[in-house]
Amino acid sequence: MKYHSIAAVLLTTSLACIGPVAEAATSVLFIGNSFTYGHGSAVRYYRADTVRDLNREGQGGVPALFKSFTQQVGLDYDVAIETRGGTGIDWHVLNRLSVITQQPWDIVVAHGFSTLDAKKPGNPEQLVQTALQLAQALQAKNPKADLRLEATFPRADETYGPKGAWYGKTIGDMAKDVRAGYDLAAKSSPVIKGVIPVGEAWVRAMDAGVADSNSLDGTDAGKLNLWTYDNYHASVAGYYLKGLVVFGALTLQDPRSLGGNECSGFELGLSVPQIKALEQVAYEQLKLSYPIKPAPLENLALESPQRCLPAR
């Protein structure tokens, strides 16, 4: 009897010490290609230890930026990446479905090839079909599946290069055409909860004078080049803007709340004015279609940028 009483006391004490059970992190899987893993920039292997690369290629990319942003505002996300360069959603459905459906993800972010269809630029048919297939597979694993499609950024080579599919049109035209394709795909299944406006944010940055609109003829003084050396993939600034838009779309947090001293931008070589300008662009784009609550900017820290805290 005495033994049982002591055991009961010890059990009660131990439970009290444990305290409330911490809520599980929100799981997010990013499915994409070089536009997600950050080809052509320092973003590709940035903080790769903070995300799970399901293909074991050691890449951080935009998912690692997203993870960093969430940590800085006190949010807990378990972030994973599954990518293959030069592919669309069709490749992942055909070759990686068993990997993708290994767990019931809370949120999945996916995008296809940058021209909608590598063989038929501007044609959304394959995107629509394979987005539906992906949605069905995710729902079979998780009845509450939440798939977000990402309307990718426009390409300078496809718009200004004479062999480009959008040659003779504007960079905004390509962004609009790509967005229209993703809007069609989003209508294919109720599992698809929305389209993240990455391409439109890029065009907004150009219209606002933050970024240059044509990297093929050089970069205007005082403006950012969102493309890297091949005029196809993004620069650090381009991927950074994409990361901010994804961050706001998934968390509904004002990107400006990260402040001009945001540590990942600092580590990747962006200046405080550049970081603030890109955050403002992301906010202006997101507020058009998301219930983003404006951050009290006057309360942001004014300290000089510092390195990000170690991964946890």
Language-model features: locations:
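Sec/Tat signal peptide C-region and signal peptidase I cleavage site
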Residues: I18-A24
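Conserved SGNH/GDSL esterase-like catalytic core that processes O-acyl groups on lipids
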Residues: G38-Q129
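Positively charged n-region of N-terminal signal peptides that target proteins for export
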Residues: M1-S5
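Alpha-helical cap/lid subdomain in secreted, periplasmic
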Residues: I100-V236, G248
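Short polar catalytic/cofactor-binding loops
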Residues: G32-Y37
